[in-house]
Every structure is written in C-alpha cells, then in structure tokens.
Amino acid sequence: MAATSIIQQLFNSCDVATVGQFSGSHSLAAVGSTAPITNLFITIFVGFSVGANVIISRFLGAQREDRANQAIHTALVLSVITGFIVSVIGEIIARPLLEMMSTPTEVLPLAVLYLRVCFIGMFFLTIYNFESAILRAGGDTKRPLYCLIISGTINVVLNLVFVILFKLDVAGVALATTIADATSACLLFRILSKEEGALQVRLDRMKIEWIYTKEILIIGIPAAIQGMLFNISNIIIQSAINSLGADIVAASTVAMNFEMYTYFLITGFAQAAITFTSQNYGAKNYKRCVQSIRWCMLLGALFTGSVSALFIIFSPVLAGIFTSDPAVVKIACIRISIVVAFQVINMTIEIMSGALRGLGNPMISTVLCIVFTCALRLAWIFIVFARIHTFESVLVVYPVSWAVTASSIVIAYLVVKKKKLIM
C-alpha cells in the first residue's frame, strides 16, 4: 500500500517537474496553489472509501462473504455518485475559491484552468479509490499497484506530449492526469469483474443496499470530515503563503512534493492499520489487533524517519529537479527542513486514527483533529502570522499542531485499547 501511494506521488512529481522545467515558475505556482483544493475534495471520497474498506474487511474477517459482496456493490454505486457530485461542485467553485485564497493575479488564470480540468478527472479518481479499497479489504495490494504503474506511465508520456509538443501548459498536465485516472479505474473494474467469490463485481448486482450504505457512512463520514478539516486549515495556510508572492508559492509547490512522499508512505501504514485491525477485530482476535498496530507504528517510524532524513540532506539537489530558479530552490529547502523533519509525528496521528477507525471508533480522532489541529492552525495564522509575516512563521504551525494532536490521539487509543482489546 505504501509503495502504491509513493508511486502515485512519483507520477504527480513528474507533472510538477514537467511544468516547472518547460513552462516556468508561474505555471509551477499555478499548479501548487491548487493543491490544497484538490486535496480537500480527494479526502471526501477517500474518507468514504475508508468506510467501505473497514466494513468489507470486517465481513471478510467474520467469513460473511455474502454480506461482503453486497457491501462491495453498494460501495461502487456510492463511488459513482460521490465522484459526480465532487466533479460538479469543483467546476462551479474553482475560480471563486482560488480568488478567496489570494492566489497571485499573475498565476490565477492558469490555476483556474488547471483546476477545472483536474475536476473532470476527479470522477474517475473516486471510482479508482473505491475499487482499490475493495481489493485491499481482500488482502490484494499488488494489482492496484500494477494498474497504477500502467496508468502513471501513460500520464508521464502524455505530460511530455501535451506540454512539450502541443504547448498546452498546465491544461496539458491536467488532461494527462485525467486520462490516466480513467485508465486506472477501468483496469481495476475489469479485475473486479473477473474475480471469483466475495470480491466479484457484476453490473446486474449494482444497487444501493441502505443497511451497508449506513455502515459505510458511519465510518466514512468522520474520516472524510477529518480529512476535509485538515485541508480547510491547509487552504487557510496556502492563502497565507499566496500573500507572500509567486516565488514562495512556487517554492512551496516544490517542497510539498517531498512532504507528499512521506505522507503517502505514512498513509500506506495507516491503511494497513485500518485493514488489519478491522479484520482481526471482526474475527475477535484482539491480540493480533494490538500486534498489527505496534508493527505499523514501528515500521512506519523506521521508513518515514529514513525517507525524511534523505530528503533533508539532499534537498538542494532534489528541489533542482523541479525548477532551475536558484531563489525558488533556496526557499523550497527551507520548507523541507521545517516540515519534512517532523513527519514522524504526523505518522502517529494517521496510524492511531486508522487503528481507532478499525476498532469502530471513527469519531474520536475526528473530534481531536478538529480541536487540536484545525483550530490551532487557524488561530496561528490569524494571530502569529498576522504579527510575524514571514514564510517560516507559517511553516512552524505544522510541527506544533502535529505534536499536540498526536499526544491526544495516543491517549485516546490507550483508553479504547483498555476497553476493547484487553480481556
């Protein structure tokens, strides 16, 4: 799962590098200024797909294959509905939201164009995430990876064709991503239709079963809300960064690529925690629940810490892949040294939240994130940044909010563990 997320980010980095090297800093800033918005919408359907993953895993762990299959078909119908709604809303609010975020005027038209094309692809990306969640629930993480490699390769090739050959600039990159997302969704649907047993998908079985919809939403809505609130706070932070000028926006775009590598590595272990915990909890194997969470934390810390260290050490060289502007590279290294250095703390939040969802307590981490992450970040921007108007003062909010939130979620997990797993 971590490999899948990292490869996905690798292809995203190719998008950014193509724009940065062949279209310039303004195009790079345009792509980067939209990131919190696209992430906001992605977290909506990822949250719902987490709900599907938990419910399907629980049925499979309890050996209720008939119910698992019904939940799968319900989840796929939900993915189509969710994807359509996200795409339509995104098209409507793209420009107003970018204007509200104080996007620099010199990059605003490019940012609007890029975002609107991306929202077309959100429909396919939603379906892909649900399909991937279904296969993960059955313990299959390889085939989503293979499909991603195929679609990602198509994405990279089309990037070069659209940007270098046809001079489509940011629209070319967004169009390439949309085509790649559609490819991956179609490939995974074909795989599921060829499955045997509980995971087999058939068009004539596609319908919403309200009993499973309710269970998916009970888990999925809190996960979606948690992700949305994180990203709303990130939109406020991006607005603060936008006010500092196009070079800093471009530099943040470069640095965020490396943050996303570590974050997707983290979410791989968080998804593992959700799947293993929910399966073993469904099978009433409480000892293995605890062991799974411990291993996810240990391996997550090892890999996240190692990758973060490499990014910090080689940050000037790595940032230079995305842009040849020395001023942008220098600023990007500042963000990497402050934010990436503390991703291990963020790892604790994600894995512990995943464990709580797998144990059937999705609201706990959501409430704690609202109180200790989102509210703190908003207060920081409106109080601290308003007085100390520098790039560094914006960035410090990340490790501070992570540390406070992680402490509260660990305490919550220990309380739930004592009640549910120690018997």
Q: What are the language-model segments listed below?
A:
Residues 49, 117-136, 144-152, 173-186, ...:
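Short runs within selected transmembrane alpha-helices of multi-pass transporters and secretion channels
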Residues 1, 5, 17, 54, ...:
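Transmembrane alpha-helix boundary and packing residues in multipass membrane permease domains
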Residues 28-88, 125-144, 251-315, 346-369:
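Small-residue-rich hydrophobic transmembrane alpha-helices
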Residues 2-54, 118-125, 214-279, 300-308, ...:
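Transmembrane helix-bundle signature of multi-pass secondary active exporters and lipid flippases
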Residues 375-385:
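Transmembrane alpha-helical segments of integral membrane proteins
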Residues 10-13, 22-25, 59-62, 137-138, ...:
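Helix-loop interface residues and adjacent transmembrane-helix termini in multi-pass membrane transporters
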